Amino acid sequence: MKHLSTILLLAASMSAGAQTHVLDVNTKKLGAPVQPTMYGIFFEDINYAADGGLYAELVMNRSFEYPNHFAGWDVSGNVTIKDDGPFERNPHYARMAPTGHGDKHSMLENRGFFGMGVKGGQEYRFSVWARVPDGGKAKLWIDLVDNATMGEDQKLCNAGVEVSGSEWKKFTAILKPKTTFAKAHLRVWADSKVTTDVEHISLFPTDTWKGRENGMRKDLAQALFDMHPGVFRFPGGCIVEGTDLATRYQWKNTVGPVENRPLNENRWHYTFTNRYFPDYYQSYGLGFFEFFQLCEDFGSEALPVISCGLSCQFQNPDPTKPGVHVALDDLEPYIQDALDLIEFANGPADSKWGKVRAEMGHPEPFNLKFLGVGNEQWDYDEAHGGFGPVFTARLKKFSDAIRKKYPNIKLIGTTGPNSEGWDFDLLQPRMKELKVDLYDEHYYRNEKWFLSHGLRYDSYDRKGPKVFAGEYACHGSNKHKWNHYYTSLLEAAHMTGIERNADIVHMATYAPLFAHVEGWQWRPDAIWYDNLRMFKSVSYYVQQLYAMNKGTNVLKLTMNKKPVAGQEGQDGLFASSVWDATTGEVIVKVVNTGDQAQPVNIQLQGIKGARTANTITLCHDGMDDENTLDEPEKIIPQPGTCQVEAGKLAAYINDNLPAKSFRIYKIKK
């Protein structure tokens, strides 16, 4: 019946004068391999992606290290900050002393990240480092509260901790709220008659991803796993550079005991004054060890990015200004950091940095293969500052040192922040001269750009480095700035060109990945969430569909012997095809960006005989519609089937592709 409906629709379209587009797929000759790393994910701590997001810690400013030491905390009674605590790089702690007013208790109340989302019946692990300075005993009372309730009792649940001795020790308790609440607070009450010191106050759900104590929020990590990422780029883009060198991302600060990982500012807390979050910092609870663990969990190749000694060039355009960029002659510590990172990931457990990894619970190497040097860096020509090769001169020093000691590591350079223009044109040939293995392209562009760049990679130099499309998304005009259906559809169209050119494009990652609905600075994003719920944008599903149907080899697909890339006469169609040796399937992806349904005839050269094919379709009428927390599955891919007909020379599919739709055909050969 479905097949009959398809024929009738096709006939109706043809009778109305619509041209049938013939897509020729050559299944007899395999093209370039599709790299396992082709479709991946890129994590940057923007939009509260780490603290308040993927990292499951519920307490904000748990070690009192924010510049405002009580940021995130409400205080009552006699509470002061001291700076001689047990952790060298996080020395501050809170002293909770008697108030001098009878039984009145000193109290700390943490508001979390836009509140604390807690679920009824689930256990939460409270922990604190504490001591009684005079060596006696004291009790801490721990409450999870709804402090806005009109009910008789604010407490959702409570527990107690007995503290004893003048030495710092870790104490734990389990809290189990009876009801679910999105905006809970954590209260810590001190003994009214004894001084108690507290440090690193923490609250985690016990049900984290893989059950790890310093773990990830389970639903968000699961969403990443479900994307089937072949590569995982981390820890970010601009945060790698830092506003200045002091605030750059330093991986060594993110490993070892979590209590001793020093706080760093997050450059995204002040970048946009219209979305200003002054209490947005990086606790580094989610550090390089945890990133490598996630790569292992997901089956992804790790792609860490390190500072090249240039802070953000947007904010510091003059490279001669003292203190914002490292002089070439002073690069050695930065290069050593890169070498040490490779040892941390791959070195034996008895090496200096391999030992750190082993002590964290992973004596086996992580088998790192890729390393990015720099983010959106660039050189200058005479017409644009005249400062010369400030990036590539530094990149060469990194490359020489890394190639000498670790020749098997694949190095990734960059062509700067733009997908075309003087800086891109300057850097692209220099990446070839430096013989980097891949270079990282970034493009956040509008609808017109995505519609007109379907052939972007067809003319790229095949003799140079491979391409990593490391950050991209369609940023629609006006209200399309959100994750609307139409912009996601254009991303799907663009990705046919990425796939068709798998011989030159080896990696591609959409960006950004995460956004908290109350704490975002940048949109669109792949995954949105609040403290309890999450939803996957349409862009997420586009990425997932490509990753789950990437195949193993490109198959040539043409219309009138031309690539199907929205060219003149193709009526807004984009298409690509791959062979999947694992499943024995020919996979054809077709995107119709046009306003009308398009009848298509897909000729499957090399396949004979009728059969039924599986389809997956992403189609929606409202171009401005999107998924939301309240309607998380408003727009999702739909499975189906279609009939493959037995032609005289080749099997074929007749279909009427709906307007503004993306359809995948999976044909057993």
How would you label these PLM feature ranges?
Residues 19-283, 301-303, 318-324, 328-329, ...:
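Extracellular and organelle-lumenal recognition/adhesion modules and their flexible linkers in secreted
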Residues 41, 128, 228, 295, ...:
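Conserved, mostly hydrophobic/aromatic
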Residues 156-160, 170-172, 205-207, 213-215, ...:
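Active-site cleft segment of glycoside hydrolase catalytic domains centered on the general acid/base Glu
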Residues 175-178, 182-185, 208, 212-229, ...:
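An active-site-proximal structural segment forming one wall of the substrate-binding cleft
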Residues 566-568, 592-669:
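C-terminal beta-sandwich/jelly-roll accessory domains of carbohydrate-active enzymes
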